[in-house]
């Protein structure tokens, strides 16, 4: 079993932004990771939760967790974009050591294609 390093980024979005905008932020940050040459391993929407203490006058936030691996250059690009964004009220990236998390189907992406044999039509009988 190989112990590869990977990164987990947890970020908190403002609670007052609409659902469509939340999805656009999730897609934007996921695409940034891919454009930086890294791979998105997992993307989990944790939902709206109460904060332990107020951040920027907000008592709640929308939590999103993003697991990715790469050479580490993607972290700088991602955190710079989050720092500039007014919709991200807090973020943290942690480098993890250990087995890579099992890949899941990321919302907004296509599921793996079924077996080719299942899609092949049967020849018609004459």
UniProtKB/Swiss-Prot annotation:
CDD domains per UniProt: bS6_chloro_cyano (cd15487)
Gene from which this protein is expressed: rpsF
Record-stated family: Belongs to the bacterial ribosomal protein bS6 family.
The protein's name in its UniProt record: Small ribosomal subunit protein bS6
Ribonucleoprotein is among the record's keywords: yes
Role: Binds together with bS18 to 16S ribosomal RNA.
Pfam families reported in the protein's UniProt record: Ribosomal_S6
Membrane-spanning residues: none
Organism: Synechococcus sp. (strain CC9902)
GO molecular function, one term: small ribosomal subunit rRNA binding
Compositional bias (Low complexity): 107-120
GO cellular component, one term: cytoplasm
Alphabetical keyword list: Ribonucleoprotein, Ribosomal protein, RNA-binding, rRNA-binding
């Amino acid at each position: 079993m190989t112990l590869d390093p990977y990164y987990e980024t947890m970020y908190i979005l403002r609670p007052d932004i609409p659902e469509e905008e939340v999805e656009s932020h999730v897609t934007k940050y996921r695409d940034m990771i891919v454009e930086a040459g890294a791979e998105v391993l997992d993307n989990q929407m944790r939902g709206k939760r109460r904060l332990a203490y107020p951040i920027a006058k907000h008592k709640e936030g929308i939590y999103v967790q993003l697991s990715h691996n790469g050479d580490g250059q993607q972290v700088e690009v991602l955190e710079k974009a989050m720092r500039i964004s007014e919709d991200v009220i807090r973020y943290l990236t942690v480098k993890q050591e250990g087995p890579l998390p099992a890949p899941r189907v990321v919302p907004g992406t296509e599921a793996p294609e079924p077996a080719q044999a299942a899609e092949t039509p049967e020849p018609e009988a004459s």
